[in-house]
UniProtKB/Swiss-Prot annotation:
Belongs to the RuvB family. Its EC number is 3.6.4.-. Residues 271-356 are annotated as: Head domain (RuvB-H). The keyword ATP-binding applies. It comes from Polaromonas naphthalenivorans (strain CJ2). Mg(2+) binds at T82. This is Holliday junction branch migration complex subunit RuvB. Gene3D superfamilies: 1.10.8.60, P-loop containing nucleotide triphosphate hydrolases, Winged helix-like DNA-binding domain superfamily/Winged helix DNA-binding domain. Homohexamer. Forms an RuvA(8)-RuvB(12)-Holliday junction (HJ) complex. HJ DNA is sandwiched between 2 RuvA tetramers; dsDNA enters through RuvA and exits via RuvB. An RuvB hexamer assembles on each DNA strand where it exits the tetramer. Each RuvB hexamer is contacted by two RuvA subunits (via domain III) on 2 adjacent RuvB subunits; this complex drives branch migration. In the full resolvosome a probable DNA-RuvA(4)-RuvB(12)-RuvC(2) complex forms which resolves the HJ.
Length: 356
């Protein structure tokens, strides 16, 4: 199958605020990203440990013809939690209903979803850590006993009735597993942490996506896109589409190493995979706060970004690459960060720079 972006109306897309953000795109960009998602484990790349476990658990559930145990997927944004949930439903041969924690404001919102599930269906709740306490309370008996208690009527005439549900599988996704309440976390029988992808894994993803987009690309060009994608498939696919645009206008349509380098330089994505926001973050820590330790709120105010975005989107990759440390006293830039910006570490302080 070849995906043509002409199939999607892109005329009123809002401008991207940050190319390397792994946050979900606009609905129309999301439509293209959905078309690039693998549908089966056979097409799925990376997350070897989580994939192997899920394949075994799904195979066992299919063999016994019962609902898969509830699944919690957690990790930084853009690593494929939603994609995995679709694959789980597809491999189980059942339907999937999708929602998110903030959308489920009242118990009746969740009850409407649960009562419409068919036997062994999958219910996917993104940002499950943002469920309200009152909705979460309704979810507990549904997860354990496939039953919910709902109130009928109001005032003195109100009464509670118990409804039986079809067996189902809840797949919860979160970037902040630590914010889940213990009672909710304990009700997941399968917990999988998604890790950043290697450049080699991302190169395979980029190659597959280029084929679906009918975008000619050599191996070197694909690998250059992959290694600058912050270990994140969503970013890799987003960069691929922008590099393809550059190749069509400034080249002969083929994504080569030279085309990839020039396109990514135009997008301000450096060889380390950092963009302007990453460099702005490191510059704030090093130049404004003497390398740290500095609190998150101070950094957020300094660079004009929300604390939650910094924690979820910017910091994980910087920490994973060894450019930043989180300590009890605050954030500290590492020697690698100083070298990357071409700034000399404070004289006489290099040895103590990274003490916690």
């Amino acid at each position: 199958m070849t995906i043509q972006t002409d199939d999607f109306d892109m005329s009123d897309l809002p401008p991207a605020r940050r190319m390397l953000s792994a946050a979900p795109a606009s609905p129309k960009e999301e439509a293209i990203e959905r078309a690039l998602r693998p549908k089966l484990f056979d097409d799925y790349v990376g997350q070897t440990k989580a994939r192997e476990q899920l394949e075994i658990f799904i195979g066992a559930a299919n063999k016994r013809q019962e609902a898969l145990d509830h699944v919690l997927l957690f990790g930084p944004p853009g690593l494929g939690k939603t994609t995995l949930s679709h694959i789980i439903a597809h491999e189980l041969g059942v339907n999937m209903r999708s929602t998110s924690g903030p959308v489920l404001e009242k118990p009746k919102d969740l009850a409407a979803l649960l009562t419409n599930l068919e036997k062994n269906d999958v219910l996917f709740i993104d940002e499950i850590h943002r469920l309200s306490p009152v909705v979460e309370e309704i979810l507990y008996p549904a997860l354990e006993d496939y039953q919910i208690d709902i109130m009928i009527g109001e005032g003195p005439a109100a009464r509670s009735i118990k409804l039986d549900l079809q067996p189902f599988t809840l797949v919860g996704a979160t970037t902040r597993a630590g914010m889940l309440t213990n009672p909710l976390r304990d009700r997941f029988g399968i917990v999988a942490r998604l890790e950043f992808y290697t450049p080699e894994e991302l190169a395979r993803i980029v190659k597959r996506s280029a084929g679906l987009l009918n975008a000619p690309m050599d191996a070197e060009g694909g690998f250059e896109i992959a290694r600058r994608s912050r270990g994140t498939p969503r970013i890799a696919n987003r960069l691929l589409r922008r590099v393809r645009d550059y190749a069509d206008v400034k080249g002969n349509g083929t994504i080569t190493l030279d085309i990839a380098n020039r396109a990514l330089a135009m997008l301000d994505v450096d060889p380390q995979g950092f963009d302007l926001m990453d460099r702005k973050f490191l510059e704030a820590v090093i130049l404004r706060f003497d390398g740290g330790p500095v609190g998150l709120d101070n950094i957020a105010a300094s660079i004009g970004e929300e604390s939650g975005t910094i924690e979820d989107v910017i910091e994980p990759y910087l920490i994973q690459q060894g450019f930043l440390q989180r300590t009890p006293r605050g954030r500290i830039a590492t020697l690698a960060a100083y070298r990357h910006l071409g700034v000399a570490p404070p004289r006489g302080n290099a040895e103590n720079l990274f003490e916690e």
